[in-house]
Curated annotation (Swiss-Prot):
Record lineage: Bacteria, Pseudomonadati, Pseudomonadota, Alphaproteobacteria, Rhodobacterales
Domain notes: Consists of three domains; the N-terminal catalytic domain, the editing domain and the C-terminal C-Ala domain. The editing domain removes incorrectly charged amino acids, while the C-Ala domain, along with tRNA(Ala), serves as a bridge to cooperatively bring together the editing and aminoacylation centers thus stimulating deacylation of misacylated tRNAs.
Catalytic reactions on record: tRNA(Ala) + L-alanine + ATP = L-alanyl-tRNA(Ala) + AMP + diphosphate
Cofactors: Zn(2+)
Regions annotated as coiled coil: none
Annotated InterPro entries: aa-tRNA-synth_II/BPL/LPL, Ala-tRNA-lgiase_IIc, Ala-tRNA-ligase_IIc_anticod-bd, Ala-tRNA-synth_IIc_core, Ala-tRNA-synth_IIc_N, Ala-tRNA_ligase, Ala_tRNA_ligase_euk/bac, DHHA1_dom
UniProt GO MF annotations: alanine-tRNA ligase activity; aminoacyl-tRNA deacylase activity; ATP binding; tRNA binding; zinc ion binding
Protein name per UniProt: Alanine--tRNA ligase
Enzyme class: ligase
Cellular localization per UniProt: Cytoplasm
Amino acid sequence: MPSLNDIRSTFLDYFRRNGHRVVESSPLVPRNDPTLMFTNSGMVQFKNCFTGLEHRDYTRATTAQKCVRAGGKHNDLDNVGYTARHHTFFEMLGNFSFGDYFKSDAIPFAWELLTKDFDIPKEKLLVTVYHTDHEAAEIWKKVAGLPDERIIRIPTNDNFWMMGPTGPCGPCTEIFFDHGPSIWGGPPGSADEDGDRFIEIWNLVFMQNEQHPDGSMTPLPKQSIDTGMGLERIGALLQGKHDNYDTDLMRSLIEASAHATSTDPDGPGKTHHRVIADHLRSTSFLIADGVMPSNEGRGYVLRRIMRRAMRHAHLLGAQDPVMHRLVPALVRQMGAAYPELTRGQALIEETLKLEETRFRQTLERGLRLLEDELGHLPEGSPLPGEAAFKLYDTYGFPLDLTQDALREKGRKVDVEGFEAAMAEQKAKARASWSGSGETKDAAIWFDLAETHGATEFLGYDTEQAEGQVLALVAAGAETASVGVGQTVQIILNQTPFYAESGGQVGDTGELRTDTGRARITDVKKGQGLFLHFAEVVEGEIRQGQGATLVVDHARRSAIRANHSATHLLHEALRRALGDHVAQRGSLNAPDRLRFDFSHSRALSPEELAAVEAEVNGFIRSNGAVETRIMSPDDARALGAQALFGEKYGDEVRVVSMGTLAGSGKGTDGQTYSLELCGGTHVSRLGDIGLCVILGDSASSAGVRRIEALTGEGALTYLNEQMKRLTDVAAALKAAPAELVDRVKALVEERRQLQNEVAQLRREAAMGGGAASEAKEIGGVKFLAQVVQGVPGKDMPGLIDEMKARVGSGAVLLISDTGGKAALAAGVTPDLTDRLSAVTLVKAAAEALGGRGGGGRPDMAQAGAADASQADAAIRAAEAVMGG
């Protein structure tokens, strides 16, 4: 019986033999499509190839694409674990043609692979075609010998695929497997098609038309193929299973869950194990691709999936975090096919453990609240939206987690009420991304890239170069020229200006032509083009002119120093804190650097000092910074660090810094820092000058942020700090070396003086001011006193002294603090069961225009706006006692 890993390899090997390039799966976070939350099909990374906006050095491709469907239009989350074929994570096997072959090849490819390589009996297969696609039907008859009754013509959009409202589209043919009459269900297109007898295993899309905004449709100049076959589904079929969760890969994860929770994988908790197995895959792959749990966007979807799995682990009786303990089982199954899992294992485990530990603190309380709410409702009635929102807002229960919990009880949630409560509190709504269209502005850059090709970057070797102005874009449109005062985006054939990427800001500088001069204020990258944001400061700039390009040297040098220091900082943090440390973001600007990294706690002062010392040690060593070009695989083999979610081509730049015996990195195993990086760097570490860490703070859950200065910025900062130190020493009339002891002495002296002042205030207050004699009200002694200038913090001590004077009774103290009143009341312990200081102080405060007040039955305090009516306040307290 072939494993899922075998099936994946068989698929890719088949198409490799048939002239296809095996292309790595793209990340789950789409690189160039902001409208799509997660990669959810194999064609996503090839979208621009199909539209003609991108050309690659191959026209046939095959992939095993990792996909997530857990939000927006494609949301399988609610059904995961309860059905045989719903998943949040799945692998889509596909073959693609970009203007190369079409139906007459795509259909034979599919038939041969299924019936020969996968050895599926031909009589078990049937197909659907779009009702007007006679060509596909005839090819099926010719290639497969299928009779008419096993070529079902479908008139609905189920067999007509469209990329969006406009763009490439075309009919598709779907291949089905017949499990036989022992399983209920009818063929596709019939009334019983939702049964499980006939299962779709492969969809072949024939992109042959283009849909226009006016609704018309015209043939595409280049016809293309896009196919998709779910690995889990074909795997179940080839392993003789009717349930995807019974395949070898899913079964191994289910058994790992059962082992970790000491439960039966097929017992009453079977559904819980299925949910955990599925969600382990989606959460692990999302983290490996750079998504971290948060309260918005992709991070929130990840958190929803994590917490749903964690609730099911809780239902299995797990008392401690479970998910992170299952990661090794996943890596064993899928790490070879997806090396990013292995590389990110430590981060995945730490993130899962941290999130589950935090959520577990509120999970049980939230579930108790849910049970309490249900206990007050009639049998079968839905949970009010306000209650569901409270679970979300207070206990971190995503709505679908609450729905999942209620599903087991046959209940639902008032979703409209939940949404109304969400809107009322103005909580952040999850982003709802759908579609796959491009913006109008983006189309300009696609067109320019198509016309002129990518910009050549020269800035690794020079800060000045000659180039040609290929295009000028102002106010979102191309223009032939721009004059003084106009802002413009300039496209050149080549440039020494670095475009913002990888955390490094874009260069600034100047562009000069024979007719004008422009100040370059920023450079960004899009579709391979370097977009030079500029303002014309002299004459005019014309399309087609030659130009001299000069980068601001001082600014570039400062940026280089900060970027190189970031690499040293990254390695020093990994060595100090552990291999789980991974870059989560950075900023390399001329005036500072910022480095975000995965770590769950604040660094101690000692850890920060050690990291800073290690970085500066390598700076002082003045070792050479070397850059080599190699394949990503070769770079990783040498131990190079790659950034999560970063797109790498066939060749990468690998930057090495410093020497450390036994590091295991580099060709000699003695390189200190080795990273894949496209940024600019110093030539020797000594060029950084100095690195000063300013501090460590939380950036987001599980992510810390360090900010630092280098070079002249660091020196200026230290000089300023030294001046402050000198100024303080002069003010205290002490040498700088004596400052710590001097400040400690001053703090102690101040503390003693504060205590003395407080004591004097108490003595003055008790010895002066308006004081009444203790009187008896309702059989209880009552003593009231009005004092001047006693702050609220000193009043509890005075109340204790007043209670001591009366022995048994109640006391009230009113202090005039500059027109406003501070009040305190006290009741001796023997009377607190019948009289409360809180009641007394509230009544007195209300007489002075105050509201509230609180404390204990034996001592309470309050404040009020008007201290002039102290007598009225005393009478109000007396009235309470006499009442």
